[in-house]
């Protein structure tokens, strides 16, 4: 059974207690899970604290509503709609992070609120990429580039000793240049969150998949946020959290973290960089 199946919130698999099984047993009983699920959830709770709730794996009740509306809009629906605030606020009553109980000794996870749902989409891909990179390093791999759906992890430098060159997606998908910047990475990771991924429109307004935990709506202050970090899991979590923060708050958080940089693309296409970001670009060398 692959790691992705363990983190699945939509499907059950025989003999595997995944995130869906945890959700199905919310308010009923603890679920015995594999160590990697406990590790992921423990990491997620740490990132919740670090980002002051900017990334929240316990808001599945809200995210599932947006998922359903988005799927309808991207499917055969001729009249795409936006969920009402009443519907969202009702679901938001069931996203208290304190209702997630991890028991390391028993190897279990329990959601105390029967209506709470986990959704690890904001952290699972980056966390999995980091674990894969760690496994490769332990096996003796010294030069590699991994790309898991936009989560890029570099192990060492290229075989010729030069850094890996990685393009940052231009959020304007119709632009002549597909990359808005190119960075040089050695033992670093890159993750981008953007409004150009998984969105639909209603009355000319874009509704993307990054839902702000406070507003319960997509946050449209940026077109994209890119994070550079030595750890792919943290980069993934930060890309969502910083996307959901005011610029000054996100910049303050990034500047407080070691070896971590960020690039914000604003709605008008202008760019804002953290203080050390330029060192990874051609202009900074």
Language-model features: locations:
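Mature catalytic core of soluble alpha/beta enzymes
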Residues: 4-285
